[in-house]
Amino acid sequence: MEKHLIALSVAALLAGAAPASADIKMGSLYPFSGPLALLGDESARGLEIAVEEINAKGGVQGEKIVLVRGDAVDNNQAIGEARRLISVENVAGIFGSFSSGRAVAASQVSELAGLPYFELGAVADEITDRGLENVYRANPYARDFAQMIVEMLQKKIAPKLGRDSKDLKIAVIYEDSSYGTSVAKHEETFLKEAGLNMVLSQSYPGNTVDMSSLVLDLKSAGADVVLQTSYQSDSVLFLQQANEGGYKPSAIVGAGGGYSLQPTADAVGHDVIEAAYDVDFTQFAVNTSFTPGLEEFVEAYKKKYGETPRSGHSLTNYVGAKVILEALNKVKGFDAAAVKQALSAVDIEAGKNAMGYGFKFDQNNQNERASMMGMQWQDGKLVTVYPDAAAISEIRLPQ
């Protein structure tokens, strides 16, 4: 009943509204305030640069793209802001959203209104696994995190440790939102399929303020490898309390989130995060022959924002948005059929853009060519160490 009423109200508002200008409005729906604001804002910056570049070349279908912000501070507000963007601002579609929970909630609203929702950064399976016709995702998703983490553990980390990967005691810890639970589920599956020894799998509230008991559980389990899926605050908290508690596993591997942020390294101390691994979207210390256009993006970012990018989230959103907008420029209109036609025709091989991966949308509207990179914190910087074609450094062992 609620979905029916939402659909009716949105349809009624759209029917009675007329666009104020020939500009094409698009929603920019991210957490701009609240605990996820840093990565939300960083993600939105990539979208903004992409739109500026597209507009400088004539826009899309001859019209200028105008971004209208919506602040998805939590899941309920994501729903409210999606409704506002659609019914009041009359956007032709919505870009977002970094947070999986926000994306799942807000994309349901756009689906009911028959408008496209373009996800550029959130990773939960359910975003594109619900059978929604108008939800598209350009970036890698939870399964890709887990696959790369287990692959790197077997092929790079265990050999560097001088250990057989099957002898390692592995713990999976994760924040309990859609993001954490999706990645952890796949980690458990890939570990089991590889015959690796998982000694602990434990969730925790993303807003927790004390992880000392979890550190004790990891010690008790004898875990010498920890796989953590976390946002920034819980990444910082775990690294700090593990260090304070004298817990030093042979390897800590993050699944993006806080582990990809320079402010995380600065907050915990470069000595504390040294040699921690991170699997995530492409970051900036990478072999640029594998990621053409990356250096130009960094220069555009610095020119616009007066600083270097804070994480690769901006790059991911930038590349995904450009691919989508360039595809939309090849069709007529922004209705569901036109969007489907545009994105179904996308066929980009790996190594042709600043992310390094290719683009082709599958039957679920998921970019099936999206993939992850393996990084490590070395001397206060996050550098790419895997795969070899993208690496700029060998991995190091913690001291």
Curated annotation (Swiss-Prot):
Domain of life assignment: Bacteria
Listed GO biological process terms: amino acid transport
Signal peptide from the UniProt entry: 1-22
Coiled-coil stretches: none
UniProt entry tagged with the keyword Transport: yes
Keywords linked to the UniProt accession: Amino-acid transport, Signal, Transport
SUPFAM superfamilies membership: Periplasmic binding protein-like I (SSF53822)
Similarity comment: family membership: Belongs to the leucine-binding protein family.
Protein task: Component of an amino-acid transport system.
PANTHER family according to UniProt: ABC TRANSPORTER SUBSTRATE-BINDING PROTEIN, LEUCINE-SPECIFIC-BINDING PROTEIN
Protein name: Leu/Ile/Val-binding protein homolog 7
Organism: Brucella melitensis biotype 1 (strain ATCC 23456 / CCUG 17765 / NCTC 10094 / 16M)
